[in-house]
From Swiss-Prot:
Keywords: ATP-binding, Kinase, Nucleotide biosynthesis, Nucleotide-binding, Transferase. GO terms for molecular function: ATP binding; dTMP kinase activity. The keyword Transmembrane does not apply. It catalyses: dTMP + ATP = dTDP + ADP. This is Thymidylate kinase. The gene is tmk. Its EC number is 2.7.4.9. One of its GO terms (cellular component) is cytosol. Belongs to the thymidylate kinase family. Phosphorylation of dTMP to form dTDP in both de novo and salvage pathways of dTTP synthesis. ATP binds at residues 7-14. One of its GO terms (biological process) is dTDP biosynthetic process. PROSITE patterns: THYMIDYLATE_KINASE.
Length: 207
Protein backbone atom coordinates (compact mmCIF):
# COMPACT_ATOMS: atom_id res chain seq x y z
CA UNK A 1 0.00 0.00 0.00
CA UNK A 2 1.18 3.49 -0.89
CA UNK A 3 0.23 6.29 1.53
CA UNK A 4 1.12 9.94 0.98
CA UNK A 5 1.03 12.71 3.58
CA UNK A 6 0.45 16.17 2.11
CA UNK A 7 -0.05 19.59 3.62
CA UNK A 8 0.93 23.23 3.83
CA UNK A 9 4.11 24.37 5.52
CA UNK A 10 3.87 23.86 9.27
CA UNK A 11 0.95 21.44 9.07
CA UNK A 12 2.80 18.63 10.85
CA UNK A 13 3.02 16.20 7.94
CA UNK A 14 6.60 15.12 8.63
CA UNK A 15 5.72 14.37 12.25
CA UNK A 16 2.61 12.47 11.17
CA UNK A 17 4.69 10.44 8.72
CA UNK A 18 6.96 9.32 11.56
CA UNK A 19 4.05 8.57 13.90
CA UNK A 20 2.31 6.50 11.23
CA UNK A 21 5.48 4.59 10.45
CA UNK A 22 6.03 3.80 14.13
CA UNK A 23 2.40 2.71 14.65
CA UNK A 24 2.44 0.38 11.65
CA UNK A 25 5.79 -1.13 12.63
CA UNK A 26 4.44 -1.70 16.14
CA UNK A 27 1.62 -3.67 14.53
CA UNK A 28 4.14 -5.87 12.77
CA UNK A 29 3.95 -4.28 9.32
CA UNK A 30 6.91 -3.85 6.98
CA UNK A 31 7.16 -0.11 6.35
CA UNK A 32 9.35 2.19 4.28
CA UNK A 33 9.04 5.91 5.07
CA UNK A 34 10.45 8.38 2.58
CA UNK A 35 10.05 11.99 1.44
CA UNK A 36 9.99 14.34 -1.52
CA UNK A 37 12.00 16.00 -2.66
CA UNK A 38 14.46 13.36 -1.56
CA UNK A 39 14.25 9.63 -1.05
CA UNK A 40 17.33 8.87 -3.13
CA UNK A 41 20.87 10.29 -3.32
CA UNK A 42 19.87 12.33 -6.37
CA UNK A 43 16.63 13.44 -4.74
CA UNK A 44 18.40 14.63 -1.61
CA UNK A 45 20.84 16.65 -3.72
CA UNK A 46 17.92 18.23 -5.57
CA UNK A 47 16.28 18.97 -2.21
CA UNK A 48 19.39 20.73 -0.93
CA UNK A 49 19.80 22.66 -4.17
CA UNK A 50 16.24 23.96 -4.39
CA UNK A 51 15.38 24.55 -0.74
CA UNK A 52 18.64 26.15 0.37
CA UNK A 53 17.97 29.91 0.70
CA UNK A 54 21.49 30.73 -0.52
CA UNK A 55 20.90 29.01 -3.89
CA UNK A 56 20.70 31.62 -6.66
CA UNK A 57 17.19 32.16 -7.98
CA UNK A 58 16.06 29.58 -10.54
CA UNK A 59 12.95 29.66 -12.70
CA UNK A 60 9.77 27.76 -11.77
CA UNK A 61 10.23 25.63 -14.90
CA UNK A 62 13.71 24.62 -13.78
CA UNK A 63 12.37 23.76 -10.34
CA UNK A 64 9.57 21.71 -11.88
CA UNK A 65 11.85 19.55 -14.00
CA UNK A 66 14.32 19.08 -11.17
CA UNK A 67 11.47 17.83 -8.97
CA UNK A 68 10.24 15.51 -11.73
CA UNK A 69 13.72 14.10 -12.33
CA UNK A 70 14.11 13.46 -8.61
CA UNK A 71 10.71 11.73 -8.53
CA UNK A 72 11.54 9.46 -11.45
CA UNK A 73 14.68 8.34 -9.61
CA UNK A 74 12.78 8.00 -6.33
CA UNK A 75 10.13 5.77 -7.88
CA UNK A 76 12.68 3.60 -9.68
CA UNK A 77 15.18 3.21 -6.86
CA UNK A 78 13.01 3.23 -3.74
CA UNK A 79 9.22 3.31 -4.04
CA UNK A 80 8.75 0.58 -6.65
CA UNK A 81 11.21 -1.90 -5.07
CA UNK A 82 9.63 -1.34 -1.65
CA UNK A 83 6.09 -1.92 -2.92
CA UNK A 84 7.17 -4.97 -4.91
CA UNK A 85 8.69 -6.41 -1.72
CA UNK A 86 5.37 -6.06 0.09
CA UNK A 87 6.19 -2.98 2.16
CA UNK A 88 3.77 -0.24 3.06
CA UNK A 89 5.32 2.94 1.65
CA UNK A 90 4.63 6.26 3.40
CA UNK A 91 5.81 9.34 1.53
CA UNK A 92 6.03 12.87 2.95
CA UNK A 93 4.79 14.74 -0.16
CA UNK A 94 4.38 13.32 -3.68
CA UNK A 95 3.09 14.53 -7.03
CA UNK A 96 0.16 16.55 -5.65
CA UNK A 97 2.69 18.88 -4.02
CA UNK A 98 4.21 19.49 -7.44
CA UNK A 99 0.79 20.20 -8.93
CA UNK A 100 -0.04 22.63 -6.13
CA UNK A 101 3.31 24.39 -5.72
CA UNK A 102 4.52 24.58 -9.32
CA UNK A 103 1.23 24.26 -11.20
CA UNK A 104 -0.97 26.51 -9.07
CA UNK A 105 1.12 28.72 -6.79
CA UNK A 106 3.96 29.29 -9.26
CA UNK A 107 1.48 29.71 -12.13
CA UNK A 108 2.79 27.07 -14.54
CA UNK A 109 -0.71 25.65 -15.00
CA UNK A 110 -2.49 22.93 -13.07
CA UNK A 111 -3.36 20.82 -16.12
CA UNK A 112 0.11 21.14 -17.65
CA UNK A 113 1.92 20.09 -14.46
CA UNK A 114 -0.61 17.33 -13.77
CA UNK A 115 0.07 15.86 -17.21
CA UNK A 116 3.83 15.87 -16.63
CA UNK A 117 3.40 14.31 -13.19
CA UNK A 118 1.29 11.52 -14.64
CA UNK A 119 3.97 10.77 -17.24
CA UNK A 120 6.53 10.38 -14.46
CA UNK A 121 4.25 8.37 -12.20
CA UNK A 122 3.37 6.08 -15.09
CA UNK A 123 1.55 2.90 -14.14
CA UNK A 124 -1.37 3.15 -11.72
CA UNK A 125 0.60 1.27 -9.08
CA UNK A 126 2.52 4.48 -8.43
CA UNK A 127 -0.58 6.48 -7.61
CA UNK A 128 -1.21 6.66 -3.86
CA UNK A 129 -3.84 4.38 -2.40
CA UNK A 130 -4.48 7.06 0.22
CA UNK A 131 -3.50 10.72 0.38
CA UNK A 132 -3.81 12.31 3.82
CA UNK A 133 -4.05 16.09 3.75
CA UNK A 134 -3.20 17.91 6.96
CA UNK A 135 -5.15 21.11 6.46
CA UNK A 136 -4.24 24.20 8.43
CA UNK A 137 -4.77 27.95 7.87
CA UNK A 138 -1.74 29.29 6.03
CA UNK A 139 -0.96 31.95 8.62
CA UNK A 140 -0.99 29.43 11.46
CA UNK A 141 1.31 27.07 9.59
CA UNK A 142 3.78 29.85 8.92
CA UNK A 143 3.75 30.88 12.58
CA UNK A 144 4.67 27.34 13.53
CA UNK A 145 7.55 27.30 11.07
CA UNK A 146 8.86 30.65 12.23
CA UNK A 147 8.99 29.35 15.79
CA UNK A 148 10.87 26.18 14.85
CA UNK A 149 13.84 27.13 12.70
CA UNK A 150 15.23 29.27 9.92
CA UNK A 151 13.00 29.16 6.86
CA UNK A 152 13.79 27.44 3.57
CA UNK A 153 13.07 28.99 0.19
CA UNK A 154 9.39 28.03 0.07
CA UNK A 155 8.63 28.62 3.73
CA UNK A 156 9.95 32.18 3.35
CA UNK A 157 7.41 33.12 0.68
CA UNK A 158 4.58 35.59 1.52
CA UNK A 159 1.28 34.62 3.10
CA UNK A 160 -0.62 35.03 -0.19
CA UNK A 161 1.55 32.31 -1.72
CA UNK A 162 0.82 29.90 1.11
CA UNK A 163 -2.88 30.69 0.93
CA UNK A 164 -2.78 29.54 -2.71
CA UNK A 165 -1.06 26.36 -1.57
CA UNK A 166 -3.80 25.59 0.93
CA UNK A 167 -6.56 26.34 -1.58
CA UNK A 168 -4.80 24.17 -4.16
CA UNK A 169 -4.62 21.15 -1.88
CA UNK A 170 -8.26 21.53 -0.88
CA UNK A 171 -9.29 21.69 -4.54
CA UNK A 172 -7.45 18.43 -5.25
CA UNK A 173 -9.04 16.79 -2.23
CA UNK A 174 -12.48 17.91 -3.40
CA UNK A 175 -11.80 16.51 -6.88
CA UNK A 176 -10.62 13.13 -5.53
CA UNK A 177 -12.79 12.38 -2.49
CA UNK A 178 -12.32 8.61 -2.73
CA UNK A 179 -8.54 8.77 -2.32
CA UNK A 180 -8.16 11.83 -0.06
CA UNK A 181 -8.52 12.03 3.71
CA UNK A 182 -8.68 15.60 5.02
CA UNK A 183 -7.35 16.04 8.56
CA UNK A 184 -7.54 19.12 10.77
CA UNK A 185 -3.92 20.17 11.22
CA UNK A 186 -4.87 22.10 14.36
CA UNK A 187 -5.94 19.01 16.28
CA UNK A 188 -3.44 16.83 18.18
CA UNK A 189 -1.42 14.66 15.81
CA UNK A 190 -2.47 11.56 17.73
CA UNK A 191 -6.07 12.22 16.67
CA UNK A 192 -5.01 12.56 13.05
CA UNK A 193 -2.98 9.37 13.36
CA UNK A 194 -6.00 7.44 14.61
CA UNK A 195 -8.07 8.65 11.64
CA UNK A 196 -5.34 7.62 9.22
CA UNK A 197 -5.15 4.19 10.84
CA UNK A 198 -8.91 3.78 10.46
CA UNK A 199 -8.69 4.67 6.77
CA UNK A 200 -5.71 2.35 6.33
CA UNK A 201 -7.55 -0.56 7.95
CA UNK A 202 -10.57 -0.04 5.70
CA UNK A 203 -8.36 0.02 2.61
CA UNK A 204 -6.41 -3.04 3.70
CA UNK A 205 -9.64 -5.02 4.02
CA UNK A 206 -10.48 -4.19 0.40
CA UNK A 207 -7.12 -5.32 -1.00
Amino acid sequence: MFIVIEGCEGSGKSSLTELLKDRLIAEGKAVVATREPGGSPLGERVRDLILEPSTPSISPYTELFLFLAARAEHITKKIFPALESGNIVICDRFHDSTIVYQGIAEGLGKEYVTSLCHHVVGEKKFLPDLTCLLDIPADEGLRRKQQQKSLDKFEDKPLAYHTKIREGFLSLAEAHPNSYLILDGRQPLEESLNKVMTAYTELALCK
